[in-house]
Regions:
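S/T-rich, low-complexity, solvent-exposed segments of bacterial secretion/appendage proteins
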Residues: 1-174
Length: 174
């Protein structure tokens, strides 16, 4: 295809082999001039390339950040807390964990790529030697976090708290 008049313009692209949550895409250049992206929800892009650059550099990165914040919310909602209520033990990841454990991701702070890093806590995963009863009883963070010391099968306080945590609003990094 011919861009501009009758002489084909040189369109170049600096390729990127793979994209992580923090990768900045390579520039698209026409005659050596970087192509700017469109802006806004009703895009200002005046062509398919500008719209694609906007999608890659703005829309997709916003969606990635939103997924990362949802992942942080899950880690926080299912966190184990000090069962004594004294606050002597810090909160620690419960059902969902991440590479920064035993610390919790900071509230209201974006952790780029977190959605791709969270996993089910091995303490609760029977396929790797854990037990699903740890979700009901507590203890993924160690013996100090066990809330159901008797092991009663009808104990549901933690499960109810997790459900209530999912209903709470959380602060997202803008």
């Amino acid at each position: 295809a011919t861009l501009y008049e009758t002489v084909p313009r040189a369109v170049t692209f600096d390729p990127t082999a793979g994209y992580s949550a923090t990768t900045v895409g390579g520039a698209i250049k026409i005659d050596g001039v970087p192509l700017s992206s469109g802006t806004g929800g009703n895009t200002t892009a005046s062509g398919k390339l500008q719209a694609m650059v906007q999608l890659r550099d703005s829309t997709a990165t916003t969606m990635q950040s939103q997924l990362d914040e949802i992942a942080r919310g899950l880690i926080s909602a299912f966190a184990e807390t000090d069962p004594s209520g004294t606050g002597a033990l810090p909160d620690t990841p419960g059902l969902f964990t991440w590479p920064g454990a035993p610390a919790m991701p900071a509230d209201g702070t974006l952790v780029p790529g977190l959605a791709g890093l969270i996993k089910v806590n091995p303490a609760m995963d029977s396929t790797v030697g854990g037990s699903a009863s740890v979700l009901r009883d507590g203890g993924a963070g160690g013996a100090g976090y066990v809330a159901n010391a008797s092991g009663a099968a009808s104990y549901s306080d933690l499960l109810i708290r997790y459900s209530q945590n999912l209903d709470k609003p959380i602060a997202f990094d803008p």
